[in-house]
Each structure stands twice: as C-alpha cells, then as structure tokens.
Amino acid sequence: MSKFEKDGVNRRELLGTSLTAATLAGTAGLAAGGATIMVANQAPAHAESDDDHHKKAMVPPGKLDEYYGFWSGGHSGEVRVLGLPSMRELIRIPVFNRCSASGWGITNESLQIINESLTPESRAYLDSIGQKAYLNGDLHHPRPSYTDGAYDGRYLFVNDKANTRLARIRLDVMKCDKMVQIPNAHSIHGLRLQRYPRTGYAFCNGENRTPIPNVGKMLDDSKKWSSVFSAVDGDTMQVAWQVIVSGNLDNNDADYKGKYIASTSYNAEEGRTVAEMTASDKDHIVVFNLPAIEQAIKDGKFETINGAKVLDGRKSSKLGITVYIPVANSPHGCNAAPDGKHLIINGKLSPTVTVFAWDKFDDVFAGKIKGEEAIVANLEVGLGPLHTTFDGKGNCYTSLFLDSQVVKWNIDEAIRAYKGEKVNPIKQKLDVHYQIGHINATHGETKEADGKWAVALCKFSKDRFLNVGPMKPENDQLIDISGDKMVLVHDGPTYAEPHDATIVHASKLN
C-alpha cells in the first residue's frame, strides 16, 4: 500500500489532485518565478515484485509443481491444465470442442459422450444442418468435486454457456466421461457444487429468461418468461430437479452444511430492454433451501416439463423453497468463505461487497427476520467488484474490473465497521494488468484454504507482452499472498478466453 493509499487517497483522486496541483503550481511559477509543486511525479503504488518472491514461483527443470490449476478455455471449449506456481501449461482437455490431436469430437467414442444426453430439439437442429455434434462451446467455471468441504480429486465439472450443457471430467485420467444438456434452461452460466456431505449435486444457473416450455408461445410477454435453477446429480449426470425463479440468475455458491445455495440475480424488473432491466436501483439474491426443495420433490409438488421435475420458486410461490433478498443493482460474483459462516456478494455496478451470515437464513425462512437482517457487513471496495477469493486467515481478495486492481480486506473488520466501529477493513490494493475478471486462490473455495497463491485472470494485456497483432493475449497474473502484502510475481500470456480457474494441491489427485 502506498503512502497515498494509507492517507486515504486513491489512484483516481491522486490523478485528479495531481493535475489540479500541477496546473495551479505551473501558473504560479510563471507568474512569480517560484518553484512548482511536482505532485504529478509522485506515482501511485504499482504491483512491484522482488527477487525473493520470484524465486518462490520458480520450478527448476526436473522438479514438479505443488498445485494443479484448472483453467476454463471459454470459447475454445477446452480445459487447460497448468502447474502452479510455475504457470507452465501441462495439457489441454477437449470438452465442448473438436481436437485433431486426440480425436475428441471426431471418434465414435467421444461422439457417444458428447451426444448421449442432447435434448430432442438439439438433435433435430443438428440433423437439419448436417452436423453430428455441436462444434463449439463456451466453457466456464471449472469446479472440482468435494467431500466434507474439501477437494476429493474425483471429478472436475464445467459448464457450457453457449449450448446449455454440463460436462464431467475424470481427474484420474484427465478426460471427459459424461455430458448432459439441461432442458428448460437457457445459457448455463453460474456453476457451483454441493460441498457437504459430498458432490452430490452440481448447481447450474440458467441465466437467460425464456418461456417454459419454450415452444414458440408467450413470445410477446416477457413477464411470463423465467430463468431456471437446476441440480444435476454428479454421479449419474442426470437432472435431479429444477426451480423456476424470478429475474435473471447469474452466479451461485453453496454453503458448508448442505442447507442453502445462494445466487446473484439481475433484472428483478423482468424487462426486455436495457431501460426496462435497469429501471430499479435494486436487484436481489435468491436463496434456495435444499432440504425444503428435496421434501417438495418427495411430496410430488413438481410439474414434469421436458422430462425434468420442476418446482415453482418464483416470488409468488407458496412452497417456501426460496427467499429473495434485495441488494444493490446487478450483483455478480457469489462466494462462500472458508470459515463456513459468511457469503460474499460482489456488487459489479455497485462499488461494494455485501456480507451475509449463512446461519441467519434459518430465521429468514422461518419468517422471524427480514432478508436484509441477514446482512452483517457492506463495504465499499472500489469500482467494478466482480469476484472474491480467500486465504483462510479471514482475509478476502476481490477483483475490481474497472479499477484493474485486487483489493485485500478483512471479513471480521468489515463486520465491526458495519456496526459502527472506527476500523479500516481494507488492507491493500494491488494494480493488475488489466481489467481483471475472476480471481482464485489456492484451495480458496474449500475449508482448507492455505493462503499461498492467487491468480488474477485479466481480460486485457495491452502493453505487457511483445506485439502479436490486433488480437492480444489475455494475462493471467500470479500473486504471492502468503505475507502481509500481495506481491505480483508472474505474467502469463493466455489465448482467448480463460474465464475462470481453480487451484488444487497435487496431493489431492491420484
């Protein structure tokens, strides 16, 4: 943290102050021949790294990395496996794409996996254009399976936003072995897994709202469209149940007790145009009550649509399986802290993160408190907060897309500040390069978060690498978070478009 940040001056304020001071001082100097105040020469803190931190990230020839990193390939449709901390690419796992090197998407065996769970509508569409399978995919959110809140090394689950699919990769052989196309939903985006007692369910957010069933009716009345929250059985790779919700679902995450899943949501207005979708300054999160959902399925309170058991979880529903809690407009990332107690909602359009207490949802569902009373902190962190990861020591690391920074802050101090105590929860802001999206730390999404490394996935590299023409590589930056201060130690050029990554200790895989 720079002197200016300690004194409460951020980069944007410094720039404005510097320009003003330099202009005024220059004018005074011309008029009186006096010395000008060179405030503009005092630059904000940059993400400098030193030799000691660089050496920690070096893996000599013949030596092995400590961690596996699983990178989503975005529109390439593949998973990229890296070693950490070296950031060396080890292999690529084709999933939603075709691969001439391995034959994936070409051989009968792979086509069987890719096509076995396509919906009838997709099969008919592919037949009409003379294709055996989809040739593309938008692979997001690689998530390893859990047992009791820790990675168990069995599977990696990934979603396809382009064609509404979920795929499973066996981690013992690093190959895709199952795939399912999810009916009724459209554009699977948010993907997180059941942490307790095990995975269990893969929870999938259908982001875009469509008529259900989508058979060419209700096209002119968007109020009758819905997003769909789906639970896929991770063992059978079949849709277990679905919940229709109000608004557009974005990202989700599950607790560490097997009781609740929360999802960010935008377009509470349920409009179609940008003006309609952003008319309100509030949106909401949706909290799903897993035991209540499973009981409703047992009691037969579902409707079967396109072969799936579908429950009504909209605001008007009387089933008691969801609650809607207002938050600032268009929340994005949804991240469960390793302490098992807290849930972080990242504001995106709001410069804030909102902290919920998982156990307070018991009273919200019981009607004892309002949803807003489950909020225990609300902290201003910077512009464009998208995602948060954790070090297991009570600290959070939030990506700031517009500021191109990672901000380190403390949960307990944020809660104390929310109660009115004079404490500054923000510990450091680190420049990254540039426009960071996802961020993830070593085991940061488990109860075993170890606080060693974090990876910042930056959308633009700009001037960080040799020029290769108009399509620049993206930039995956390795950050040492083991000490009191974050230190940038590596720039990794990456072909478009890694969307997210998770990091697993090598000892977890067989």
What is the predicted role of each segment?
Residues G8, S18, A43-N510:
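Predominantly soluble domains enriched in secretory-pathway, periplasmic, or organellar proteins
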Residues A31-A47:
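Signal peptide processing junction and immediate N-terminal pro/mature segment
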